[in-house]
């Protein structure tokens, strides 16, 4: 049986994600972000609810990406997630993309030319953001073309880099329905952006989200719930440069901007430059919010949930892999657990996110 890995945020889970799970074959293992997202924002609903939605709609195992994988630029996000999935025995990685190209060929390009490609990046002017530099690199060394806003395609290129030497097959699936950033409601497969934008339209949500009650009946979180905490952290921090990725220039810009910013969008707009993209600034603000410093990664893999089929696979791995099914007196990952505690502060109805929680188990008969 083919073991397929999928890297996801499911923020929130929607019909497009269900389509992806129905399209790929075999046992499906999801490496999913926790309570903070790659583009620097809190999850709309907590990681346990998102895991349950995935398991009820085709996923067999959901594992958690540690904080310092979830909240990172595309290359580090991809590398950390693929490293975890490879430990779980995946043979292929499936992902949605706007442009279906031969990503397998790009793995071979990177395997042969990684040193030259990395050296080329260092020759590009500092006024370019890292994503802009990366696009230029792929254009020069592999002839990859970029057309407009294609975030999934760009992430696919990071998957290709991270898969070098891993002996896994990349399985791109053409993205269906609305574009990634589209707010349009007139699609059967609406985007996560549209769903977050129209949360009060229950008819739209019920048609766009499988098991919509799980989304509708749980707290909906955003930066608005944490902005006052962030402001306190910035104004009272003695040395912002001790925070991960904060240099003197950014520390100064952030300290000045917070005094005149009324919300997160205003703050990000004020701090961002050509060099410091809005996504990067948002991630850095998350680091400040949770007081993240030197990045460390846990050895164990935190299991958020599984089906009967997934449980059978995990039993084969448990003697040779450090699988964590319950966080007790001993921590799994201190940084992720601290971030979970801060996420909880945003709403009184968010339950405990780490200590004592056990995996969600969905019984099914799909054991063949």
UniProtKB/Swiss-Prot annotation:
GO cellular component terms, A-Z: cytoplasm
Binding positions for ATP per the UniProt entry: 7-20, 96, 152, 175
Record localization: Cytoplasm
UniProt family annotation: Belongs to the TmcAL family.
Main location: cytoplasm
Catalyzed reaction equations: cytidine(34) in elongator tRNA(Met) + acetate + ATP = N(4)-acetylcytidine(34) in elongator tRNA(Met) + AMP + diphosphate
Organism: Streptococcus pyogenes serotype M5 (strain Manfredo)
Enzyme Commission identifier(s): 6.3.4.-
Protein name listed in UniProt: tRNA(Met) cytidine acetate ligase
Protein transport in keyword set: no
Highest classification ranks of the organism: Bacteria, Bacillati, Bacillota, Bacilli, Lactobacillales
Keyword Ligase found: yes
Keywords, in A-Z order: ATP-binding, Cytoplasm, Ligase, Nucleotide-binding, RNA-binding, tRNA processing, tRNA-binding
